Amino acid sequence: MNPKTSSPMVSIFLILGGAVFLVFGSLHALYTVLDLRNPRRLVPVDPSVAQAMANTALRLSPGDTNMWRAWIGFNFSHSVGVLLVGALAVWAGLRISTLPSAIMPALILIGCVYLVLALRYWFPDPAIGVAIATACFVAAWLRSLI
C-alpha cells in the first residue's frame, strides 16, 4: 500500500469493523453450541417445528442427515465465515503497511453481501452490527485515499 494508508485511523477502522464481525460470529457459534444441549436461542419458537426438523430427512441426502443436523451445521459454518471475515479485517488492521490495495474493497464487498443477507433474512441486531462493521471498512478505505 502507499504511505497514505499507514494512517492509524485506517488501522483503527479495520480493527473495529473486524471486532464487530468477531463478536457476532463468536456469539453465533456460542449460541449454536449451547443449543445442542438446551435449544432456546437459534431455534424455532414452536418446539414441534424443531422436532419435525429432527424427523425430516434432507432431500439432497436422504437417510444421511436430517434437517435439524443440517440446521446446526449451517449455523456453525455461518459462524466460521463471520469469524474469518472478522479475523481478516483485524489482521489487515495490524498489517496495514504491507497489505495489497485490494483488501479494503474486498472487505467492503463482503460486508455489503452480509448486509444484504441481514436485511433480507435476519433480524435487526445482526443487520445493525454488519452495517456498523461495513461502515468501518468504508471509512478505512476512504481514509486510506486521503
Regions found by a protein language model. Name each.
Residues N2-I12, R59-I72, T98, P124:
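Juxtamembrane loop-transmembrane helix junctions in multi-pass integral membrane proteins
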Residues N2-I15, W91-A102, L142-I146:
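Helix-coil boundary and interhelical linker segments in multi-pass alpha-helical membrane proteins
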Residues P8-L22, R69-S79, L83, S101-I108, ...:
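Alpha-helical transmembrane segments of integral membrane proteins
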Residues V10-V45:
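N-terminal signal-anchor transmembrane alpha helix
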Residues R40-P44, P105, G111:
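Membrane-embedded alpha-helical bundles that constitute the cytochrome b-like, heme-associated redox core
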Residues G93-P105, C112-A131, S144-I146:
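Membrane-helix boundary connector in multi-pass membrane proteins
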